From Swiss-Prot:
GO function terms (MF aspect): antiporter activity; monoatomic cation transmembrane transporter activity
Protein name per UniProt: Na(+)/H(+) antiporter subunit E1
Upper lineage: Bacteria, Bacillati, Bacillota, Bacilli, Bacillales
Name of encoding gene: mnhE1
InterPro entries: Antiport_suE1, Cation_antiport_E
One cellular component term from this protein's GO annotations in UniProt: plasma membrane
Amino acid sequence: MAVQLVLNFIIAVFWLFVTNSYTTNNFVLGFIFGLVLVYLLHRVLPGRFYVITLYRIIKLIIIFLIELIKANFDVLKIIIKPSIKNEPGFFVYHTDLKKDWQIVLLSNLITLTPGTVVLGVSDDRTKIYIHAIDFSTKEQEVESIKTSLEKIVREVGEI
């Protein structure tokens, strides 16, 4: 991916020199021209076409921000309630992710959402130990992690 992106920037800068016009519009035109060239050459360049990976990373960021906003509202509801009826507790989340960086990324995303903290990962890397501020919603929490965060982390990892 990095090789393709650097090559695209080199083509865009080369386009500026060839056209002898150093404007932003011309750079964008050169970048689009480079994008087409990199796409035509992506079979001989290492890795998957970088736009696909870039799209997946942007999708990961958007999904995480949505989950972050939802978790903020959940914690806000707990804080605003006059009586405390939440049940904090620990649970084990079983993951299917294989690569270490994917497990670390998922753990960080879980920790960054309010109301949950990852305490550790098992030695065989199949279980993530999580503390939740409201244990009564464990099934919802597991389903939310499985269908959104873990799914998109797996997609980003498919190279």
